[in-house]
Amino acid sequence: MSLFIFGNVWLNVKQGMEVLHLQKEYLDGLYVIMILGFARIIDAGTGVNGLVIGTSTFWRFDFYSGVVLLAFRLPLTWYLVKNYGIIGSAIAELAAYAVYNFVRFEFLRRKFNMQPFNKKTLFSIILTTAAYLICYFLLNSIGGWTGIILRAILFSSILIIGIFYLQLTPDANQLYDNFKKKYLVK
């Protein structure tokens, strides 16, 4: 889901700023949006780690890893903002959450022999990248609301069809079944 949202946002953010006639200075923040998007993808990809750790007998590790995140993030943010400005803040966020989630990932892997990734994760990343590149190269020259809508429809369609065809997540089938029961079957 985070790849779906980020892909749609990143495909259309620049044109969205232009269509909404936002200040040109906001375009300088595009890479901040990209870096923060990557941080959210990492956090979402390892999102259940905190729930598993927090409800286990190792719940203290959840607290300590949060303290380590804070102790790592604050000085890193200060240093990077001081030297690189607003993009430094985004880089600090990405680095802090990457380290934080890696530590929790390793903890779960070692203590419980659990990890959230498999080959379908790789297929999801490849599918999203392919959908992004197709939309970017086919439709990037189309501006305005038309371009935004076309890119969003094509990107979303490629991902949704690919997710169902490749059976990348059982959640998608459950969501579809619930939708079908609620709206299509009477």
Name these PLM-found stretches.
Residues E18-V19, T55, K82, R110, ...:
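Transmembrane helix-loop junction
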Residues D28-V32, P116, K120-S124, T128, ...:
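Residue-level signature of transmembrane alpha-helical entry/exit and packing/kink sites
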Residues M1-L3:
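Selective transmembrane-helix segments that form parts of the transport pathway or gating/packing helices
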Residues F58, R109-N118, I142-W145:
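Membrane-interface helix-boundary motifs at transmembrane edges
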Residues F137-K186:
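Membrane-proximal transmembrane or re-entrant/amphipathic helices at the cytosolic face
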Residues R110-I125, N173-L184:
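Interhelical loop/hinge segments that connect adjacent transmembrane helices in multipass membrane
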Residues K14-Y26, L139-G147:
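Membrane-interface helix termini and inter-helical loops of multi-pass transporters
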Residues F6-G7, L11, Y31-T57, F61-V81, ...:
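Short runs within selected transmembrane alpha-helices of multi-pass transporters and secretion channels
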